[in-house]
Regions:
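Short aromatic-glycine-(Arg/Gly/Cys) micro-motifs in beta-strand/loop hairpins
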Residues: 1-15
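A short, charged, amphipathic alpha-helix used as a generic interaction element across diverse proteins
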Residues: 24-38
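Short, mixed-charge low-complexity intrinsically disordered segments
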Residues: 37-57
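Residues in well-ordered beta-strands of folded domains
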Residues: 6, 21, 44
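Short histidine
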Residues: 22-26, 56-57
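A short, exposed loop/beta-hairpin motif centered on an aromatic-Gly-Thr core
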Residues: 15-22
Length: 57
């Protein structure tokens, strides 16, 4: 399955997209969490938002 992880700045602008190919949504969530750094990450599958992961403070 194909997913998109969008790196989102605090002002809401997308700064990057990472295409993720995984066997299932659980794996996609795990990989998206690993991408979180200073910016939030939104995990999408097509036009469906799966989850938004916020950076730890």
């Amino acid at each position: 399955m194909q997913y998109q992880a969008y790196i989102v700045r605090p002002d809401g602008h997308i700064v990057n997209r990472v295409d993720v190919v995984c066997t299932d949504e659980v794996e996609a969530r795990r990989l998206a969490k690993q991408v979180v750094d200073r910016n939030a990450v939104e995990l999408w599958q097509g036009d469906r938002l799966i989850e938004r992961f916020e950076p730890e403070e």
